[in-house]
Amino acid sequence: MERITQRPHPPRGPGQPGEWPNLVPQSMGCLTGSTPWPEAWPEPRIDPLAWVADSAVVIGDVRLAAGASLWPTAVARGDVCPILVGEGSNVQDGAVLHGDPDQPVTIGVDVTIGHRAVVHGATLEDGCLIGIGAIVLNGVTVGAGALVAAGSVVTRNVPAGALVMGAPAQVKRQLSAEAQAGQRQHARHYRQLAMAHAQARRENG
């Protein structure tokens, strides 16, 4: 994993998504002008029970809660606004997280972000799933349990439990409770898989 940091490690946060809004004012916050020099960036806060692949890139004000995972070649770049990844959420291979001034990235609990997806200045609520190659743009909130289909471009808020697809994404139908539970189970599977990778890393040095 590549980390670009310049300051001493700050105190570890509580790692609970419900408490994160209170942490934002204590961080660098969201910039209103140009990106400062790296010396101004806080160091990432990665819970000991989170897993970050060696080839993932974590820069600046990024916080991963327990059980969160960042997979190979994923990028979390917190040089403009904070990036918060909640407990048990996974950011899969090649996905990109980044914010804009006053538009941080906030990811809830048991969220799945598929391969090569982009989440830019958006909020993903608990249990939602962002499909492979989908793009979620600034200011959007994807509601709890929602599903963004692969390749979609999301430009407006997604209701909780909705399936959206297309470019721009449109609501197609409401997901069943079983389908929403399945998405959270998928995230839990990735949490277990991340633990296996972490164990293999420890065993192999």
Show the residue positions of the predicted features.
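N-terminal segments that cap or nucleate solenoid repeat domains
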Residues: 26-70
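Glycine-rich hexapeptide-repeat left-handed beta-helix
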Residues: 3-45, 79, 83-87, 93-100, ...
